[in-house]
Amino acid sequence: MRSIGLVLIASSALARCAAGVPQREEASKVPTMTTLPKDIYPESRSRLPLPKREALDEQGKRVYDSVLDPKRPTLAGFQGPAGIWLHSPRVGEPFREMNRILRNEVPLEPRLRELAILVTAREFDSQFEWTAHEPVALKEGLDPKILDIVKFRKAVSEAPEKETAIIAFGRELFRDRKVRPETYAEMLRVFGQTAVVNITALMANYAFTAVMLTAFDQQLHEGRKPLLPFP
């Protein structure tokens, strides 16, 4: 069991390197073993065990292999959403494909893509999602001041119009469960109809992921510092 866990940690670190995620934080300290909740499997760091590849059907094997594919790097390896989807590959395979399209093929500036993800993670208080994407957002050029507005739930002031529109839209969508006409009109003015649909789909995709992470109590990788403060 211990050897499997070490392999998974190593593979997830390699995946983060392949994705261009900064490794400064992990490299600056020696990981320490933490005590997991009693219902958490150490090899998956969630409430679900990590299936062996040979026990999966053909679709499950495709999902498994895609996680290890260097052409499709994940931020978390098997100790994250991908590990959860191995238990339902019929749902997981198309969901992961939609995530890939939204992240890589939809024409949205990378910093705004990551901002939309972070707004979603903050509104769902998803520690795993936030901690995975904060370094990516900064790498993609998101202003740290904008990041802090989302992180600490500050009022939006003196922010660029695109960032302001996304933050207001996401907060109303998830916090208020409705979007005011004037907020929608501003999104439409700034981005146009197609982009508003794509941004909404991106946020919905990560809201779905946040729910899955919460249900199965996905823990951070061993030695990973949580980056999202809880009120």
Task: Label every PLM stretch briefly.
Residues 1-3:
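Positively charged n-region of N-terminal signal peptides that target proteins for export
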Residues 5-15:
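Bacterial N-terminal signal peptides
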